[in-house]
Amino acid sequence: MADPVSVIEIWGGEPLSGHIPVSGAKNSALVVLGGTLLCSQTCRIRNIPDLMDIGRMTNVLEALGLKVTRDGSMLDVDGSHVSHSKAPYDIVSKLRASFFVIGPLLARLGVARVPLPGGCAIGARPGELHIRGLQALGAHVHMDHGVVHAYVPGARGKLKGAK
């Protein structure tokens, strides 16, 4: 016999209907926010949780020249004026997800300078996997005094597909 606590029985024979709001997922939202660097127009993103890490990522984007406006759980991110390729240490040091801006900066500007990220220190999570991925796409990447310097060589300065 099953434990009565682990069983849910529904009686009544009536169809169920309705809506259950689901909160946004922070880690997914951080990746999407980094991806807004690829857009030269305004991106509207819905169901974004109002959390400290989301605020830090929007601060990183604003420091790079994007304009971010929040209305409840919706963010408008205007990427028409990306003006910097270097993310500021004082913000990046508090957020591991800030590493997600390197690829979009390389794709958009051909260059990125991002300090090694900080944030939640649950185990060692070096950026080596990201760096190898960027190198596979044709970027030249090196570290200097805790800052990842990446650029795309050549006159066109575009990333290429990996094999």
Regions found by a protein language model. Give the residues of each.
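Structural preference for solvent-exposed beta-strand-turn elements
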Residues: M1-K163
